Amino acid sequence: MAYILLVEDDNDLRAMLKSSLEKNRYTVIEASNGREALQKFKPLLTDLVITDLLMPEQDGIGLIMEIKKIKPEVKVIAISGGGKAGPSNYLSIAETLGADAVFAKPFSLTSFIEKVSSIIG
């Protein structure tokens, strides 16, 4: 069973994603911001980090950089609504930092789960 760290500050979206991932037999650990995610990140267990990019305390860009220092091979999916700048700028930065996939909000849950499956099985 794959272990996923899900980082999203929107409680409703995080709950929906967690439920969908668990229905697909993934183990999900939740965090509401990058700082909390770093505390919960388990390098030996984590197969995938799914992170929003715009969050309080520590954003997803900083989180990706920190996690890639700890475990460069960890897979990452970045999601963003982009705030005032729109999602494309933030998502392209995430790709440059090593995100394996990016999704602009709102996105298709079916496409999202398919991408998770293709990345970690």
Residue ranges and their predicted role:
Residues 11-29:
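Two-component/phosphorelay signaling modules centered on CheY-like receiver
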Residues 33-36, 59-62:
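Acidic catalytic/metal-coordinating carboxylates
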Residues 62, 83-103, 110, 114:
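Alpha4 helix (beta4-alpha4-beta5 surface) of REC/receiver domains from two-component response regulators
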